[in-house]
Amino acid sequence: MAKIEKNAPTMEKKPELFNIMEVDGVPTLILSKEWWEKVCNFQAKPDDLILATYPKSGTTWMHEILDMILNDGDVEKCKRAQTLDRHAFLELKFPHKEKPDLEFVLEMSSPQLIKTHLPSHLIPPSIWKENCKIVYVARNPKDCLVSYYHFHRMASFMPDPQNLEEFYEKFMSGKVVGGSWFDHVKGWWAAKDMHRILYLFYEDIKKDPKREIEKILKFLEKDISEEILNKIIYHTSFDVMKQNPMTNYTTLPTSIMDHSISPFMRKGMPGDWKNYFTVAQNEEFDKDYQKKMAGSTLTFRTEI
């Protein structure tokens, strides 16, 4: 059983809606030790599809792409509910829901699309045992850091980031919910050699969405027409999703996400980090990156 430490000291907290709990040293939003045991004991089915990401790496974007693929490009079906209510997060309970997402998963029939921010070593064993297909999306760490900072500012259930300088230090040391970005992307990169994992990059999807969506279709063994493919590309573009209340989270109460502080969907363009990092921070980040990623074959683009 993973080692659990509740309310680990990661960051100052706003009025609390989520507890921060360390699981094997990884800060998570797990409700309790008892709830973590339920997550660990989750029984996946072979046709369950898992979407795994580090926070702020394109989860909502990929969720919409997968939902449209699974619904053959039917736009109205994909507007049946807002993103958080269409498919569940394995380990989370959101403030606007009466019960944890896992309970919704257990009530629904397969096949299911299930989301998670867990690192690979904390994934319930049944997902590996049942050989579930997993789509993993990785985003370059500089843009991920900036996006995560703004998310902390606008989401009341996240710890107060204080300022960018302090958040930068905590992100670099892995003292944020989700843990170390470096460990997360490397862990899933290694796992892909042993399991059915399609490992995608945020920047690649942004640069050539058609090519990357075709990879997903092949992975899922799904055939669609060129017309439907183009429809999916259009409706999952940043500009369209930003205006779609079923994907931009504006239907949530401002007490949960305050878009007047920062919109959930801000820019979505690789390279925004350059508007925030100082020269010194960038140099420090690059040095730390080289150290932590030494020996890995993973490469990231910080702009396109």
Curated annotation (Swiss-Prot):
Catalytic activity of the protein: an alcohol + 3'-phosphoadenylyl sulfate = an alkyl sulfate + adenosine 3',5'-bisphosphate + H(+); a phenol + 3'-phosphoadenylyl sulfate = an aryl sulfate + adenosine 3',5'-bisphosphate + H(+); lithocholate + 3'-phosphoadenylyl sulfate = lithocholate sulfate + adenosine 3',5'-bisphosphate + H(+)
Entries under InterPro entries matching the protein: P-loop_NTPase, Sulfotransferase_dom
Pfam family, one: Sulfotransfer_1
Binding site for 3'-phosphoadenylyl sulfate: 56-61, 139, 147, 202, 236-241, 264-268
Compartments where located: Cytoplasm
Catalytic residues (positions): 117
Chain sites annotated for binding substrate: 115-117
MF terms (GO), sorted A to Z: 3'-phosphoadenosine 5'-phosphosulfate binding; alcohol sulfotransferase activity; aryl sulfotransferase activity; bile-salt sulfotransferase activity
Annotated EC: 2.8.2.1, 2.8.2.2
Signal peptide: none
GO biological process: 3'-phosphoadenosine 5'-phosphosulfate metabolic process; cholesterol metabolic process; lipid metabolic process; sulfation; sulfur compound metabolic process; xenobiotic metabolic process
GO cellular component, as recorded: cytoplasm
Keyword tags: Cytoplasm, Lipid metabolism, Transferase
Family: Belongs to the sulfotransferase 1 family.
Note: SULT1C3 gene appears to be present only in humans and other primates.
Official protein name in the record: Sulfotransferase 1C3
Source species of the chain: Homo sapiens (Human)
Record gene name: SULT1C3
